[in-house]
Amino acid sequence: MDLTKLTAHELKDMLSNKEVKAEEITKAFLDRINLVDNKLGAYLYVSEEEAIKKAKEIDGKIEKNEELKALSGIPVGIKDNINVKGMQNTCASKILEGYTSPYDAHVTEKIKQEEGIILGKLNMDEFAMGSSTENSAFKLAKNPWDLERVPGGSSGGSAVAVAGSEATLSLGTDTGGSVRQPASFCGVVGLKPTYGRISRSGVVAFGSTLDQVGPMGKDVEDCALLTSVIAGLDKKDFTTVDKEVPDYKKSLTKDIKGKRIGIPKEFFGDGLDKNVRKSVEEAIKVLEANGAEVKPCSLPLMDYALSAYYIISSAEASSNLARFDGIRYGYRSKNFKDAKDIYLKSRSEGFGDEVKRRIMLGTYVLSAGYYDAYYKKALKVRKLIKDDFQRVFKEFDAIVSPTSPTTAFKVGEKKDDVMSMYLSDIYTVPISVAGVPAISLPCGMIDGLPVGLQIISDYFKEDVLFNLAYNYEQSVDFHKMRADF
């Protein structure tokens, strides 16, 4: 039996029944990483010795018949912008090359408390800015379904690790679609939770009012399991909400009778690949046949979401990334005349093109004379978009759309076409702007490439997402697909 192909809940059952040891599982994944990651590029750092040590500790507890915790013995990969004590945290940027985390992020602490085995740090677009993971300063991540195609981004390594059987579970971050879009491209399940549901403490900030940590797994049950572990109040992050975290496993039922689902026409317009549309429409029919009430709806301000997003996120990025200056830590230029020269050259040499592009845009929209015309106006648009969603959720329990307008595109295809790259997130960005939760799960295959279905619900209604996603998933077999790599 290939342990790397199994889900977290399948591995948990085997560990509980003493059919396998945690060390066996861990070594199987480490062997897999050593075998395939030179081609897939999911990992930027692998913690082999520490992972085996933790696995042996868990086996000792199992031998003593101690009760297993939620993630005992389950291999997890962590995006390289989330702090793990003693491991690198580079954000896939030269400016942080060689930086080691002195502490754990809150989500990392929670995973360790539940005895998850952290295998290492995962590849990403530099500082989480990108939609293809081509912006990594260190290596290219490739889609396990087709090595000539991108895995999506910015959490491309997180999706590749799960789809390529290099981790059972992974964590990514989602600012404008960076968990959902790569989940769609790689055929795995990925959740962007409600803003404030999961702590950002110990996560390197890109857009502070947009960033959220999100789980990825092979199926909905795995995604719900990891969400239950990492969700909840964190006193170190004042944006987290003191709201009880439900037992998401109870949401995993096939009963969706009477659930009201809206189909927003704005998500099915020009630019949507006809075969992606067909796959999503087939998925909607399945939900309807299973008892959901499906009706059309409208979110008329969605056309403005992408513009508002890039103004707000770039403004926040220009502020957040000001701390990387070549003085305290990270990359420092070797050729400088004075302190000003250190700042200028370290940042110019340390940041990649996309990061510099967004810093410049953000600085521009925050500057005197343009603040009112761009940034302030974008905040007003954001409020109207939130109102749009609230209006729709008075009538519907959830809305359904494609996750991305296309399947995974070829490596290099959009690298020099910035607008085309940005448009690959056109269906995920509005959800991030509003701060509501959404999940992506596979709903079809086109020419050997996965298609993603996005389900969106109201604030803190992740249980509704898991219910609908699980119902659909159990009616089809797309979650059982494994990349033959």
Curated annotation (Swiss-Prot):
Statement: the UniProt record of this protein carries the keyword Protein biosynthesis: yes
Role noted for this protein: Allows the formation of correctly charged Gln-tRNA(Gln) through the transamidation of misacylated Glu-tRNA(Gln) in organisms which lack glutaminyl-tRNA synthetase. The reaction takes place in the presence of glutamine and ATP through an activated gamma-phospho-Glu-tRNA(Gln).
Gene: gatA
Enzyme class: ligase
Top-level taxon in the UniProt lineage: Bacteria
Subunit details: Heterotrimer of A, B and C subunits.
Source organism (scientific name): Clostridium botulinum (strain Hall / ATCC 3502 / NCTC 13319 / Type A)
Full protein name: Glutamyl-tRNA(Gln) amidotransferase subunit A
A cellular-component GO term for this protein: glutamyl-tRNA(Gln) amidotransferase complex
GO molecular function, one term: glutaminyl-tRNA synthase (glutamine-hydrolyzing) activity
